[in-house]
Amino acid sequence: MAKFKRTDTNRSLENLLDQDKSAQMSKNGGSLAKQPTRKLIPGHGLEFNNLSYSVIKKVKKDGVWINKEAYLLNDISGQALRGEIMAIMGPSGAGKSTFLDALAGRIARGSLEGTVRIDGKPVTTSYMKMISSYVMQDDQLFPMLTVFETFMFAAEVRLPPSISRAEKKKRVHELLEQLGLTSATHTYIGDEGRRGVSGGERRRVSIGIDIIHKPSLLFLDEPTSGLDSTSAFSVVEKVKDIAKSGSIVLMTIHQPSFRIQMLLDRITVLARGRLVYLGSPTGVAAFLAGFARPVPDGENSLEYLLDVIKEYDESTVGLDPLVLYQRDGIKPDQAAKTPVRKPPKTPKIPRTPYAKSPWTKHISLKSSHFSTGNMNSQRDPKDHSDQQSDVNNFDYEDDDDEDEFDKSLERRAPHTPMSMQSGVYPRLASHFYKDFSVWLYNGVKGTPRRPPTWNNNGAIKAPISGSGFKSMSSSQFSMTQQTPGPGNKTPIFTPGRDVIEYSSYNPSYEEVFEIEEVLDEPVHRHKFANPWVREVLVLSWRTTLNVIRTPELFLSREIVLTVMGLVLSSFFKKLSHFDFKTINHLLNFYIFTICLVFFSSNDAVPTFIQERFIFIRETSHNAYRASSYVISSLIVYLPFFAIQGFTFAGITQYILHLNSSILSFWLILYSSLVTSNAYVMLVSALVPSYITGYAVVIATTALFFLTCGFFLKRTQIPLVWRWLHYISAIKYPFEALLINEFKGSKHCYDGDLSDLSPGPLGDVKFSALRNNSRAALPQNCTLIGEDVLFSMDIREENIWLDIVILLAWGVLYRLFFYVVLRFYSKNERK
């Protein structure tokens, strides 16, 4: 049995067992073929241990749909250091972007397992967002802003107000020079319809936005996708300069050229969410040579590694030989060198044989050379054939009972590193498992791979079995302090708040666990760099620039309302006459006016959907508040709505000589534009595409149109659907326009009652006002305006009440819009 120094607290349970096993095998003369690895430096840079992520998907089995757990990441461990670039590579579907999201804290904590540490300390998601930036694969930028204006906006929202505007401009010019964008300083970003910067420059602008505040960590998702080799090399070269300034840079990349490979410091190669290689790009050839698959002359080592991965992935043995070799340096046997190809087969769900114990759900593949203690374990290569046979013959669906499982452990413990699908640590001796299971059954709520969180405030003394190991204070068994209070947050990727009790277990000896410091945001630090008012001003400035430089956003609706005002005026003539035909013409004119205003707001659907992706990118790291965005967009568009409403009201009032008040007419149209725009933006925030957005807006607006009281009066709508009449946003401006036109007894209408039918007025009803003032009315006054309102089932004859209710709907739509942006527009995996 190997001797362990009790002062060494940075050793994992599995690593100590590896050392014990290595000592036994060395005594027996065993040896292990080593594969080239790059040793990790504990307590430095970004460390990630045992990251696993699974999702539930529905699959059809025997004609029945069942839920199946699919693992996108499977027990990945490694490290990224400051001043270096770590590239995440792998074939399509390997989990590169998922892995990057896991490190960046963009996966919901409940669905991700493992630990992420910075300089040896666990971190919270809020702290990770505070010190890092994430550059998405797609360049979501405003096309009508220049490069300088884009960077200046980022500086205004990312840098605190304590930094003067001159210093912010200086930082922008430094960034332009650092990214090689000096020549494109005043060039528009551009898009498909507008000429702007090149693809490589556009990508560098996207990177510059997220490094304006000099983050410690930079995550980039496919920064070279869609670029030619020269532009891609230029982008990575600038990223290399960023890393040299002291940042930790991690990026996914699909097929780097040889020149780009030479810029990378470390690469992490994944395959189906499993770690295949971690080390220097120059070490890939030695890795493959040790795997008995030397790189052919003239071949690129990384590309050849991807070919080998594909070959094994499609074979009967799967990826296990590659993963085992990366993990333990175990070479495959002769049969595994040339795998027999087979049709792709959907893997079955890994299941834990010992179902009663609360083992972690993800599959254990902890690499001994990733541990912070002993870097290499010793194994007997003679036993690999037995091991490989066990791997190939393992049945995913068989569950052994406890006795059979204990016996299998006793048989396999001396020589077999079990398959990854077994869910059991291969090097656990049977006697240790029995002791450990007792510990589990006496109050453990967590799992061996994800330790529970302690509630004690002081140092915690936890008794542990002394069967061949010293402590569990490693990254795999880290204990984090839970301090009461509102400022306390659970460290990222750590388990829940369950409590462990050891009341009935007598340990061999006791070990004191030191409570780790958790890196979190300072208690008094503001989440956002700027106050709310300043954010509104800066966002309003940018939105105004976009509207001015994109005149079609304003002119298109202005032209529509102008042209339609002229067309309507030519259709509806002599509306100043006081006959029965005029009543129907007025009703038709006003309902068409309101529908025109509502449907003209549909152009906001594609506009906001484009902005939504920019909003998600900018707010993913707390650039500004969602409320600031909502209010700023409203402030900028209010004067444009006023101009548009006055244009239509002025044209129609002047040509048709309407008897209504032009001020009230304009105010009703203005309120309708504000409310309809709020509704369209709410729908745009909920739908995935502008096509769906158009469909939803048109369908709901048509429903509002049907139930507003024009086609079916309130009393004619079935009782079960009458609530639609009151939530119809068209009802209130329509009624307000009619009240503005017909209220009171100052207008008298005469004619044949047959002129009212067919028409929206229907059966004529005489109002109480007419009955009370019959004697004062002229002899030829058959109907007064009040009778028209009474016949249309309009009872509350108050223009201001209708306007207030209409604006209240607009406020409610804006509030819902804010809620969607605040809580449901997060770029985070569940």
Curated annotation (Swiss-Prot):
Molecular function as annotated in GO: ABC-type transporter activity; ATP binding; ATP hydrolysis activity
Cytoplasmic-facing ranges: 1-551, 610-630, 683-690, 820-830
Disordered: annotated segments: 333-356, 368-422, 471-491
Cellular compartments per GO CC: plasma membrane
Record field: compositional bias (Acidic residues): 395-405
Ranges of compositional bias, category Polar residues: 368-378
Low complexity: compositionally biased ranges: 471-483
E.C. no: 7.6.2.-
Membrane topology: Multi-pass membrane protein
Residue ranges of coiled coil: none
Induction details: Regulated by RAM1 during arbuscular mycorrhiza (AM) formation after inoculation with Rhizophagus irregularis.
GO biological process: response to symbiotic fungus
Domain of life: Eukaryota
Occurrences of domain ABC transporter (ranges): 46-297
Function field: Together with STR2, required for arbuscule development in arbuscular mycorrhizal (AM) symbiosis.
Name of protein: ABC transporter G family member STR
Biological source species: Petunia hybrida (Petunia)
UniProt lineage: Eukaryota, Viridiplantae, Streptophyta, Embryophyta, Tracheophyta
